[in-house]
Amino acid sequence: MATRYDDQAIETARQYYNSEDADNFYAIIWGGEDIHIGLYNDDEEPIADASRRTVERMSSLSRQLGPDSYVLDMGAGYGGSARYLAHKYGCKVAALNLSERENERDRQMNKEQGVDHLIEVVDAAFEDVPYDDGVFDLVWSQDSFLHSPDRERVLREASRVLRSGGEFIFTDPMQADDCPEGVIQPILDRIHLETMGTPNFYRQTLRDLGFEEITFEDHTHQLPRHYGRVRRELDRREGELQGHVSAEYIERMKNGLDHWVNGGNKGYLTWGIFYFRKG
């Protein structure tokens, strides 16, 4: 039986990503491997190529990855990053994710690609990670923390399960530190949350938890570029979604993508790659 979560925001996120509409949309439009923001060389590059480039760039920052490494992916989606890391480095990965539907796709693709012996897919929320203290060499996350109603708790959990000297590499769509009050409300309404994280929030919270910031690669311009690219792909391939994704979902998605693009272009949002090391 699928777990239900008491926190409404967590349960809302779980139900959204478990829905047939969302599952089919991300599989058809986004590609079904990586469902996060991409690093684009040009505006019309395939979404899957740009999304994979983000994974490649993040992994290139790590000094821990190798056959003896143990990685936790917090909010793993369909597990594309975990499979990339397992294939390239031979490391073991715990792919923790809220959506049971996504996790079933993840397990199937792991088997098809011959890496199921390296990847454990875990049905769980990252507010309560079901692993012992200090067992991971690298904690990894892509564009997932924004869905949490308690990001400070998520960061405490990341710190708890990471060994001393371990790495924390993540991305998250964030509210800019100087964002005017109230202007991102349409985005918050879409993701059913009251707040978004900011760069200062992540820096201060992780500093208090004993982390050293190694670098932040600011790729803010890629956020509206990515959501604009998804919007155009949706317009181009909308006919393929008929019978798989409801008209209501498609209309909400178009509106949501437009809000992300507008917020990014106006400087209200920021995005990039954080790289921290635990002391």
Swiss-Prot record:
GO molecular function: dimethylglycine N-methyltransferase activity; sarcosine N-methyltransferase activity
Activity regulation, free text: p-chloromercuribenzoate acid inhibits 23% of the SDMT activities on sarcosine and dimethylglycine, and S-adenosylhomocysteine (AdoHcy) inhibits completely GSMT activities.
Top-rank EC class of the record's enzyme: transferase
Example of a GO biological process term: glycine betaine biosynthetic process from glycine
pH dependence: Optimum pH is around 8 and 7.6 for sarcosine and dimethylglycine, respectively. The pH optimum appears to depend on the buffer used.
Keywords for the protein's UniProt record, in alphabetical order: Methyltransferase, S-adenosyl-L-methionine, Transferase
Complex formation: Monomer.
Protein name in UniProt: Sarcosine/dimethylglycine N-methyltransferase
Organism, scientific name: Halorhodospira halochloris (Ectothiorhodospira halochloris)
